[in-house]
Amino acid sequence: PATDTAIRKMIKETDGDHFEDMRSLDQELTFCETKKEFQKRNITLEQPQMKTLGIINQDGIYTNLALLLSDQCVHTIKTAVFEGKNQNIFKDRKEFTGSLFAQMEAVYDYIDFRNQTHSTFEKLYRIDNRDYPEVAVREALLNCLVHRDYGYSSSILISMYEDRLEFTSIGGLVTGVTLEDVMMGISVCRNKKLANVFYRLELIEAYGTGIQKIMNAYQDQFIKPEIKVSNNVFKIILPNTNAQAELREELQYHTHIQPEDEETQIMQMIDQEKRIQRKQVQERLGISQTTSGRILKQMVKKGLIMQRGRGKNTCYVKK
């Protein structure tokens, strides 16, 4: 037998109704945040424009699209930061409310604040890398806002782990569209009028480009973004680029496929400097703090070098 969700979906498809076109149950709506967003682009948002966009219907009644853009929007985004790679320990959690535009700005800032920057060194030059490419975060967030099924009350869920960032929204793919279609750039928009508003505000460039931008942001990375789809859920998983860089170094080290022998280079450094610190190894070899520390510890265990001092004063000398 069909589930309640499946029956509801079939009825919607048969009747041809769209959530954003239906009358909003709340007609006492204000649009402070949305008007600010329009003002940023020097676009007028008065009653004629509201009718054109579908915020007000032909009878002068606010639609559900109006509800989504209003300060009274009932749909929310829930975020959580977890310790490690599972959901056992919460580090932080927060729920964002208000207009979709208010949520968009606040959630992006929330993620951006926690999107750490790690530095590596290539010869004399420092290279800064954020955990998650900003364009990928932006497009994943916009995808959730524009494409989710607002006919359901479930919140968008954004979960940050040690090694990944997940965006989960209610509403699978539109009927007739496959995941393969999406990966090839095909997009059938569930909320056409909402997408049109975002398009007019230059938040999205064209329908169907978002997923490709996410993939392009990781084109030089070891692990790629992952998209999971069920009948009712769409999930985008962004790998932590700095976490995977350390994983890549681990794999290279243990399989001995490095272009140069780190231990030999470190011994040469000690011959020249007499004593060295971990940071010097990190900068000279262009590896992470974790990897440089591990190599030095292994060299101590092998009896190649000795460790002297503690904390910031720790240094390594030839045995």
Q: Could you describe each region identified by the protein language model?
A:
Residues P1-S154, M160-E162, T168-V188, G210, ...:
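Active-site helix-to-loop segments that bind/position phosphate- or nucleotide-bearing substrates
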Residues L165-R200, Q244-P259:
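Glycine-rich/acidic phosphate-handling loop/turn and adjacent ATP-lid/helix
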Residues N231-Q268:
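Conserved alpha/beta core segments of nucleic-acid transaction machinery
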Residues E260, Q277, R310-K319:
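Short, cationic-aromatic polyanion-contact patches
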Residues Q272-R284:
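Short acidic, hydrophobic short linear motifs in intrinsically disordered regions
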Residues T290:
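Key DNA-contact positions within bacterial/archaeal DNA-binding proteins
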Residues L296-K297:
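Short, hydrophobic-biased segments on the C-terminal half of alpha helices
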Residues V300-R308:
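A short, conserved structural fragment
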